[in-house]
Curated annotation (Swiss-Prot):
Residue ranges of domain SSB in the record: 4-110
Organism annotation: Bordetella pertussis (strain Tohama I / ATCC BAA-589 / NCTC 13251)
Record's keyword terms, sorted: DNA damage, DNA recombination, DNA repair, DNA replication, DNA-binding
Gene: ssb
Bias (Low complexity): 132-155
Name this polypeptide is given: Single-stranded DNA-binding protein
Length: 166
């Protein structure tokens, strides 16, 4: 059976993006995104809130775009996959693990006052296969034009209702 590793987040950036470049020149961008859940506590009746922080990494062109346009506080939509990586602590030499979201789609949300143009959607980084372009759709032949039916003139304007229907 096939498996699914898909993450979708809508949240706010907790800090400005950090962009760096690998030795081969590929851009790498790290951001922290906060998502907030709200609920009403059944026992006390008071409103509760919990914020979860997510580490997100973007690569290549998507990383460059994020570094240029995203700012702390900006609302953003992210699609990607979970990835756990293993690394060694420099001080102790112990194996450490980090789970992060590798983003392959990013959509900036909000208006211009939140740091950039609204509605800018970007994807990239992992689809190395060339995309096939579809041939332009053929328009069906236009139906022959018929003259528009003529409306009969109102017999008497006084017979019309003065009430506006909306």
């Amino acid at each position: 059976m096939a498996s699914v590793n898909k993450v979708i987040l809508v949240g706010n950036l907790g800090r400005d993006p950090e962009v760096r470049y690998s030795p081969d020149g590929a851009a790498i961008c790290n951001v922290s995104i906060a998502t907030t859940s709200q609920w009403k506590d059944k026992a006390s009746g008071e409103r509760r809130e919990e914020t979860e922080w997510h580490r997100v990494v973007m690569y290549n062109r998507l990383a460059e775009i994020a570094g240029e346009y995203l700012k702390k506080g900006r609302s953003v939509y992210i699609e990607g996959r979970l990835k756990t990586r293993k690394w060694q602590d420099k001080d102790t030499g112990a194996d450490r693990y980090s789970t992060e979201i590798v983003a392959d789609q990013m959509q900036m949300l909000g208006g211009r006052d939140s740091g950039g143009d609204s509605g800018g959607g970007y994807g990239g980084g992992y689809d190395d296969a060339p995309r096939q372009q579809r041939a332009p759709a053929q328009r069906p032949a236009a139906a022959p034009q018929r003259p528009a039916p003529q409306a009969a003139p109102a017999a008497n304007l006084a017979d019309m209702d003065d009430d506006i229907p909306f």
